[in-house]
Amino acid sequence: EFKEAFSLFDKDGDGTITTKELGTVMRSLGQNPTEAELQDMINEVDADGNGTIDFPEFLTMMARKMKETDSEEEIREAFRVFDKDGNGFISAAELRHVMTNLGEKLTDEEVDEMIREADIDGDGQVNYEEFVAMMTSK
């Protein structure tokens, strides 16, 4: 997957991509780096500072980025699965199901408490931001 994406943006086939193309490559792989993050990643791997990145450097960079975002993406996917109507909210019952499927062994009381804490406006539903905050707070 990475080699195909890399090759797509290695226009002249010389084994390097320009830093300008990096953002496009990463977005095609489902990443969404900020400009600052792109510059940081480029600086980390572009040893000679010539503005191009070879494939081994690219793999190193993607491995770092994906390790950072893996758990967040897993949470995002879990949220999508149980947000049945795709409206950006999950119900309390759906949340209970999500927690069970993520391997959390919680009592009903514990789940109810999490729902109360996460459900800021008290409408019985939890939006994505609230869900992520709940799942990542320990």
From Swiss-Prot:
Query: What's an example of a GO molecular-function annotation for this chain?
Result: calcium ion binding
Query: Which residues are listed for Ca(2+) 4 binding in this entry?
Result: 119, 121, 123, 125, 130
InterPro entries linked to this entry: CALM/Myosin/TropC-like, EF-hand-dom_pair, EF_Hand_1_Ca_BS, EF_hand_dom
Question: What's in the GO CC field?
Answer: myosin II complex
Q: Which UniProt keywords apply?
A: Calcium, Metal-binding, Repeat
Report the coiled-coil segments.
none
From the UniProt annotation, give the residues forming the signal peptide: none
Residues engaged in binding Ca(2+) 1: 10, 12, 14, 16, 21
Q: Name one Pfam family in it.
A: EF-hand_7
Positions binding Ca(2+) 2 in this chain are 46, 48, 50, 52, 57
Q: Where does the record place the EF-hand domain? A: 1-32, 33-68, 70-105, 106-138
Protein family according to the UniProt entry: Belongs to the calmodulin family.
This chain's function reads: Calmodulin mediates the control of a large number of enzymes, ion channels and other proteins by Ca(2+). Among the enzymes to be stimulated by the calmodulin-Ca(2+) complex are a number of protein kinases and phosphatases.
Which PANTHER family does this one have?
CALMODULIN LIKE 3, MYOSIN LIGHT CHAIN 1, 3
Q: Any miscellaneous information on file?
A: This protein has four functional calcium-binding sites. Arbacia punctulata has two distinct calmodulins isotypes: alpha and beta.
UniProt-recorded name of the protein? Calmodulin-beta
